[in-house]
From Swiss-Prot:
Transmembrane segments: 16-36, 58-78, 100-120, 141-161, 165-185, 221-241, 253-273, 299-319, 343-363, 373-393, 399-419, 424-444
Cellular compartment(s): Cell membrane
Molecular function GO labels: potassium ion transmembrane transporter activity; symporter activity
Superkingdom as given in the UniProt entry: Bacteria
Membrane topology: Multi-pass membrane protein
Gene Ontology cellular-component terms listed: plasma membrane
Reactions accelerated catalytically: K(+)(in) + H(+)(in) = K(+)(out) + H(+)(out)
Entry function: Transport of potassium into the cell. Likely operates as a K(+):H(+) symporter.
Organism encoding this protein: Streptococcus pyogenes serotype M2 (strain MGAS10270)
Keyword entries, A-Z: Cell membrane, Ion transport, Membrane, Potassium, Potassium transport, Symport, Transmembrane, Transmembrane helix, Transport
Family annotation (InterPro entries): K+_transporter (IPR003855), K_trans_C (IPR053952), K_trans_N (IPR053951), Kup (IPR023051)
Protein name, per record: Probable potassium transport system protein Kup
Length: 666
């Protein structure tokens, strides 16, 4: 990789700064909408809080943002980029060779990130719309929570509905809008603190520790469940590394953190000034002059939509990476935008919409949603910490230092997990159930793939070259196709699945001019597109290894078209002149792709557990994208052949011939 690429990745720019604000910080930047509200309501309301409680709460928020977001994610995790890409699956690909069990934290972390993220649009949009209760002229309408729910659902329907068309056209405004949003947070927060400058004493961690053990804190350690809301977007910050570059995050985070902290301090100052006023509005909106609240709600709604959009796009990317790592079922992926990074997965989009909408309908208020929010993301952070420890060791950090550093973060995050565990009974169970369902699907898919690798027998292609040559030249068989292409998941050296040779020679002898054996390998580099060809000393058998990055589409016909042209131009593959064609000078014949589907046989090698895995995987396949769609074969000639999973052992069942009576008497 060239130094210029590394420099560009680590370099900051004005444009990159603005783009980072719109892509990276949506989740963490909208936390001020509901974090202080959650703290105050769980304490019993504005009139129940004391100065020490407020100082302690702000101190806890500041040091949570510092320890988890700044130190762990910005200063440590951002260095763990996989060819400029971040996120838990990118981190996993960096360390997976160090231990086979690391697939477990990767799957758990990915599942919890997806499940908890489904709550983000519900919480942020609902919190923003509830701000209308503080707007003169509209408050009487939105005091009725049903109107809040209806407005929220309309916004969500539009947001999820436009995903299929791509979001590039609105993505251009994300950065400027979020710059205005953060600037407003900082400026309004600063002006609110002018009357209570003592709030800045919260920078001292003494107030944070004092509150945890103070009798004024009605919830004890469980207050950290609300504090954690301030940093739930830290994992998304790491996941979006590839979109904006490390340098732009390094430069933009201090600005974002300053604005967020000022917003929290401003809300805290307003609470101290109005704790006897009896006002029950969200401190975020109540701390702003009433004549500005309408504009603030509009801005907050835009910020909430941007945060939700970042979550949706991140979910598509996360699922896409999991599919290419073979730990998630294949779903149809489309690219509505001009670049590969802008993808759309219809099934995931509408599942997210259903979960988000059900969350709004079931919990109704943002306060109830906050009670369930953040539980699963603590698990994601713990899983990231485990993987980071291995990454630090791989990069040469002394093991004792790596263990100590990650043990510290694991302890902090485990305390947050325990504090958030109370949320399980207040709706967090829904998120946990969703996460467990995703982990179950991932496990079934991964385990099923391993079982296939364990049992399917392989044969050496070289041993069958002569038979294939004779079949090619045998005019007694009609020409099946000019080019026959087999896609194989398992092709090492010249060993190939027995089922493929069985298809060519036994099931129905397939006479062709050229036989192609294509293996697609997903690389750790996100945007690789390379190939390797072996003609096997012939001009009729071609082994192709396609090396595609885990973020590249696996549209095999496109790549194969380029490979054929390269081979013909180099003289390694004879031209295939067509007698009948509407394209003058066409020298490439027709292609047929043969896909082989392995189904569970009744062979005794499979244990009951393995049979359960394979049968469950087969059931899941009914709702997933077919290999034909996944490999971009919709417009190609395709034949699907079904073979039993185990071909290596045909069981002989005992059976006796019935002897006619007259024969036995004779």
């Amino acid at each position: 990789m060239s130094d210029s690429h590394l420099t560009a990745f680590d370099k900051a720019s004005k444009a990159g700064f603005i783009i980072a604000l719109g892509i990276v910080y949506g989740d963490i930047g909208t936390s001020p909408l509901y974090t202080m509200q959650s703290l105050v309501e769980n304490q019993g309301g504005v009139n129940q809080v004391s100065e020490s409680f407020i100082l302690g709460s702000i101190s806890l928020i500041i040091w949570t943002l510092t320890l988890i977001t700044t130190i762990k994610y910005v200063l440590i995790a951002l260095k763990a980029d996989n060819h400029h890409e971040g996120g838990i699956f990118s981190l996993f690909t960096l360390v997976r060779k160090m231990s086979p069990w690391l697939i477990i934290p990767a799957m758990i972390g990915g599942a919890t990130l997806l499940s908890d993220g489904a709550l983000t649009p519900a919480v942020t949009v609902t919190s923003a719309i509830e701000g209308l209760k503080a707007v003169p002229g509209l408050s009487h309408i939105y005091q009725n929570q049903t109107n809040v729910i209806i407005t929220t659902l309309v916004i969500l329907i539009v947001l999820f509905g436009i995903q299929r068309f791509g979001t590039g056209f609105i993505g251009k405004i994300f950065g400027p809008v979020m710059f205005i949003w953060f600037s407003f947070l900082g400026v309004s927060g600063f002006f609110n603190t002018l009357g209570h400058l003592e709030i800045f004493k919260a920078i001292n961690p003494y107030y944070a520790l004092h509150l945890l053990f103070s009798p004024e804190n009605h919830r004890g350690i469980f207050i950290l469940g609300s504090i954690f809301l301030a940093t739930t977007g830290a994992e998304a910050l790491y996941s979006d590394l590839g979109h904006v570059g490390r340098g732009n995050i390094y430069v933009s985070w201090p600005f974002v953190k300053m604005c967020i902290v000022l917003s929290y301090c401003g809300q805290a100052a307003w609470i101290l000034a109005n704790k006897h006023s009896g006002i029950e509005l969200n401190p975020f909106f109540a701390s702003v002059p009433s004549q500005l609240r309408g504009y603030l709600v509009s801005l907050a709604t835009l910020a909430a939509i941007i945060a939700s959009q970042a979550l949706i796009s991140g979910s598509f990317t996360l699922v896409s990476e999991a599919m290419r790592l073979k730990i998630f079922p294949l779903f149809r992926v489309t690219y509505p935008g001009a670049n590969l990074g802008q993808l759309y997965i219809p099934v995931i989009n509408w599942i997210l919409f259903a979960v988000t909408s059900c969350t709004v309908l079931a919990f109704r208020t943002s306060a109830h949603m906050e009670a369930a929010y953040g539980l699963a993301i603590t698990i994601t952070m713990l899983m990231t910490t485990i993987l980071l420890k291995y990454y630090l060791i791989k990069k040469g950090t002394r093991p004792i230092l790596a263990h100590l550093a990650m043990a510290f973060f694991a302890l902090v995050e485990f305390i947050f997990f325990l504090a958030s565990a109370i949320k399980f009974m207040h709706g967090g169970y829904a998120v946990v159930i969703l996460a467990l369902a995703i982990v179950f699907v991932m496990f079934i898919w991964h385990a099923g793939t391993r079982i296939v690798f364990k049992y399917v027998k392989s044969l050496n292609l070289n041993d069958y070259k002569e038979q294939i040559k004779q079949l090619r030249d045998d005019v007694c068989f009609n020409l099946y196709q000019t080019n026959v292409v087999y896609l194989s998941n398992r092709m090492q050296d010249y060993m190939i699945d027995r089922s493929i040779l069985y298809s060519i020679l036994d099931k129905r002898p397939k006479r062709a001019r050229v036989y192609w054996f294509v293996n697609v390998q997903v690389t750790d580099e996100p945007y690789t597109a390379k190939y390797k060809v072996d003609m096997m000393g012939t001009d009729y058998m071609v082994r192709v290894n396609l090396y595609l990055g885990f973020r590249m589409p696996q549209t095999v016909p496109r790549y194969l078209r380029t490979i054929v042209q390269d081979l013909m131009e180099s003289g390694r593959l004879p031209k295939q002149e067509q007698e009948y064609t509407i394209t003058p000078g066409r020298d490439v014949g027709d292609f047929r792709f043969v896909l082989i589907e392995e189904r569970v046989s009744n062979a005794r090698q499979l244990s009951n557990f393995e049979r359960f895995i394979m049968q469950t995987k087969a059931s899941i396949k009914h709702v997933t994208a077919s290999p034909m769609r996944w490999f971009g074969l919709q417009y190609s000639e395709v034949t699907l052949e079904v073979v039993p999973l185990i071909l290596s052992d045909v069981l002989k069942l005992p059976i006796k011939e019935l002897v006619p009576v007259e024969d036995s008497e004779a």
